[in-house]
Each structure stands twice: as C-alpha cells, then as structure tokens.
C-alpha cells in the first residue's frame, strides 16, 4: 500500500548510490565493465518488485543519479573544451559543438523514450519501459562523455 511505497522511496539513499559508485570504481580499476553498473541502484531498490508506481520510482531514482553524473561530466568537458578552444587559433569551437551535440542527444533521448512509452499505448508497461529508456540512455551518455573527456585530456 501507500505506506510501503513511502518507505521504498525513502530508501533511495547513500546506500543505493554507494552500490553504483563502488561498481564504477571497480570498473575504473579494470575489474568489470561499467555498463554492468547500470541498474544496480534499481536492483537494490525495495520497490522494484512492487507496483508499477514503485518500480517507476525505483527507476527514476537511479535516473537522477545518472543525470547528476551526466551534468557533472558535461560541465567538466565544457571547461576542458573552453581551455582547448582558447589554446588553438582555428575555427573549431568545441564548446559550441558539444552544446549542439548535447541538445541533439536530449532531443533524441526524449523522442526514443517517448516512443518506448507510447508503444504500449500509455499502459502500465509503457510507464516502465519509458522510464527504463531514460535511465539506460542517460547512463550510456555518461559513458560517452567520460570517454570524450579522457580523449580531450590527452
């Protein structure tokens, strides 16, 4: 019931964040591939076997983790490109290109995930697939930007 739902969303805490953080640290150390870390917070979420609302909340909680990480990596990359753009006297404005690319990616993610939702004609399964799409695409974009950052720092 509602009480259980309230409890499960409160349990989205440092514990579940630590689950992904530890997984990513292992991945960085070469112990696993970082893609295997996606869904870790969801798996640890008490509501993941509950109602649609509880499941979507669990997915949304993890999406918030990836979204915060995405914003952080994006800002770091903008800073790197801003420095690099000022070092070179060419016409490559990588800050603007990254911004355009990110805007395009957001548009693509929203369209793709809306499709994942609409495919089930707005039913409960659509809410889950739509939310899962947002989570997995956001995590995937984090990895893409982390790779770009690694290259840009060379």
Annotated model-derived regions:
Residues 1-2:
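Bacterial N-terminal signal peptides
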Residues 5-154:
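N-terminal alpha-helical modules
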């Amino acid at each position: 019931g509602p009480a259980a739902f309230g409890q499960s969303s409160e349990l989205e805490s440092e514990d579940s964040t630590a689950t992904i953080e530890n997984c990513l640290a292992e991945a960085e150390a070469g112990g696993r591939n970082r893609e295997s870390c996606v869904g870790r917070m969801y798996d640890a979420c008490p509501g993941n076997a509950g109602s649609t609302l509880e499941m979507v909340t669990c997915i949304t909680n993890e999406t918030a983790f990836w979204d915060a990480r995405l914003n952080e990596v994006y800002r770091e990359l903008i800073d790197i490109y801003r420095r690099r753009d000022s070092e070179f006297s060419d016409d490559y404005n990588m800050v603007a290109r990254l911004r355009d690319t990110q805007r395009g990616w957001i548009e693509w993610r929203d369209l793709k995930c809306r499709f994942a939702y609409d495919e089930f004609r707005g039913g409960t399964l659509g809410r889950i697939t739509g939310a899962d799409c947002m989570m997995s695409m956001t995590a995937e974009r984090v990895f893409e930007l982390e790779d770009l950052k690694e290259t840009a720092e060379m």
